[in-house]
Design a protein with these regions (language model features):
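Outer-membrane beta-barrel channels and translocator barrels
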Residues: 1-5, 17, 62-65, 113-115, ...
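Hydrophobic, aromatic-enriched interface-forming segments
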Residues: 46-84
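Short, surface-exposed, charged loop/turn segments at secondary-structure junctions
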Residues: 26-33, 72-75, 82-89
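Solvent-exposed loop and beta-edge segments used for protein-protein assembly and interaction
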Residues: 2-6, 48, 61, 98, ...
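Transmembrane beta-barrel strands of outer-membrane/channel proteins
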Residues: 10-16, 54, 69-75, 120-124, ...
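Hydrophobic alpha-helical segments and helix pairs
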Residues: 1-50
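Outer membrane beta-barrel transmembrane domains
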Residues: 80-191
Length: 191
């Protein structure tokens, strides 16, 4: 950071298709007399695809305030699956292209003293539509797969010592695709 430029941090993340993908997991009704409730036959432990995320974060200090902003783009790689159907007894091979995601956020942190800081920020993640294509068939857009998950975030950080920090936060969903509220407490350790 200098008089003309903020601190700029570049990031890059790779997501591998490990675990069980969500595609092809069959749904069933645990109670044959009640078809209002369906449950998956097993739970996914991954997203089933390769994804690459590149981002930039900007930080500017105006003591005792720090302004920050970030932007990131996630590219999801298309992948073919032997079965994407959720219907028991049905197999539907298809190529799936999850929608790419643009993430934007900005906020500020206020240092109350040398150990405590408050923060407020706004963030949004906009996902384009997911597309599927059956072998030899046309590419179709999955209805309702475009999302915008926006949230207003409040946090407090307290440095216990030079290694341990306590981070408490409350996130309020600002769009239908975001969780209504997320409340959390973290204890990051720095080596």
């Amino acid at each position: 950071e200098n008089a003309n430029w903020p601190d700029i941090v570049a990031s890059f993340r790779v997501t591998a298709p490990t675990g069980t993908s969500p595609f092809g997991i069959k749904l069933g009704t645990p109670d044959p007399t009640n078809n209002n409730l369906t449950t998956p036959s097993r739970l996914p432990t991954g997203n089933g695809i390769w994804a690459f995320t590149a981002g930039l974060s900007f930080l500017r200090t105006y003591d005792p305030i720090v302004l920050f902003a970030n932007v990131a783009y996630t590219y999801n790689v298309a992948r073919s699956f032997d079965d994407i159907s959720t219907i028991e007894g049905t197999t539907q091979p298809a190529k799936v292209k999850l929608g790419d995601i643009v993430q934007v956020g900005a906020g500020m942190a206020l240092a109350l003293n040398d150990k405590t800081a408050l923060s407020i920020s706004y963030s949004t993640a906009i996902s384009r539509a997911t597309k599927t294509a059956t072998p030899g068939g046309p590419c179709t857009t999955v209805a309702g797969s475009t999302t915008n998950a926006a949230s207003l975030n409040f946090g407090i950080n307290y440095a216990i010592n030079k290694h341990w920090t306590v981070n408490g936060y409350v996130n309020a969903g600002m769009s239908p695709d975001a969780p209504n509220y997320v409340i959390g407490l973290r204890f990051p350790y720095t080596f």
